[in-house]
């Protein structure tokens, strides 16, 4: 049976960063990374933006050149999944039937796109935007003449895909079940702004609509039927309704977790010698009032990966990384600092009509998060307000001419 001192399951951002950080921190043992996809680790965010828009080729998405991993003596088993974890034996069962031993295990599998459960969900022409294969398949259909696309889901993935497709000249309809887009992650001001932007760019954006079924001919999707009976023509459908944490084997092995796998302040699961990082890991977040939650971002995956690598190398410290996020749509750059969970007030800096403004989120008078649209200085200075738990004067906070650093 093959084995490694550290086995990392998942070859995304978190898994790659953990392997890199192990070597950077002097780890000399054996490292194996097991990845479901055939590619070496690559950046995910550009998939729904620059890669799909043909602004970046795939070789520019690699986190490190493929030759880097061999140079650092990091082994990869690509196109492979873990189907079973035996924590007592410190042994994995792989999708090819092979057994693989580990000293320490780092679970960095992220999540699988949530699928529609309605009639017609198994038709061809229905896509996620999670992997290179997802995007390549959709791009091939566009190249073959697809003109009408329906995007189901008004989160960041759906909005970013809609922006790219509309810029390419396709007819895009975006459907959101809730009263506004970004309802789970942003305040009403930001939602209203982005809804208007997409409508102004030609997207048929509809909120408070429910999908009843997908209709098709000869096994291929041709439309999306709404609960009221209307059928929206669609030669392709993109589904962006969230992810399901890919933690089945860990939970089956006895790991605690209801939404992903639970980890402590050191990213340790309830199973011995097993860590979890990234989108699949639920932890008590200091920047969300100690609420146990999963944070789906590249920043979180990378920082958790570094935290675990240092712990394995003997420098164990609690995970306290500051959360941040970004999204590019059209010519708009959104930068988010902090987590707005439970906010009770917002303050607007700047003018949304000028397409350059910030939304500051407060809870009990304390700044907990910012959404900054084309406001880089606010983002850089505002994150310090969040880190400090600042309680600024609201009138001064609303004055876009007053630098946020002066409110500390």
Swiss-Prot record:
Residues holding FAD: 14, 49, 82, 130, 279, 298
Disulfide bond found in the keyword field: no
Keywords, alphabetical: FAD, Flavoprotein, NAD, Oxidoreductase
UniProt xrefs under InterPro entries: FAD-oxidoreductase/Apoptosis (IPR050446), FAD/NAD-bd_sf (IPR036188), FAD/NAD-binding_dom (IPR023753), FAD/NAD-linked_Rdtase_dimer_sf (IPR016156), Reductase_C (IPR028202)
Required cofactor(s): FAD
Domain of life: Bacteria
Catalytic activity: 2 reduced [2Fe-2S]-[ferredoxin] + NAD(+) + H(+) = 2 oxidized [2Fe-2S]-[ferredoxin] + NADH
GO cellular component: cytoplasm
E.C. no: 1.18.1.3
One of the record's GO molecular function terms: ferredoxin-NAD+ reductase activity
PANTHER family reported for this sequence: APOPTOSIS-INDUCING FACTOR 1, RIESKE DOMAIN-CONTAINING PROTEIN-RELATED
The protein's assembly and partners: Monomer. The dicamba O-demethylase multicomponent enzyme system is composed of an oxygenase component (DdmC) and an electron transfer component formed by a ferredoxin reductase (DdmA1) and a ferredoxin (DdmB). In vitro, dicamba O-demethylase assays in which DdmA2 is substituted for DdmA1 demonstrate that the two enzymes possess nearly identical activities.
Function, in words: Component of the dicamba O-demethylase multicomponent enzyme system involved in the degradation of the herbicide dicamba. In vitro, catalyzes the transfers of electrons from ferredoxin (DdmB) to NADH. Both NADH and NADPH support enzyme activity, with NADH being markedly more effective than NADPH.
Protein family according to the UniProt entry: Belongs to the FAD-dependent oxidoreductase family.
Name of the protein described by the UniProt record: Dicamba O-demethylase 1, ferredoxin reductase component
Gene name per UniProt: ddmA1
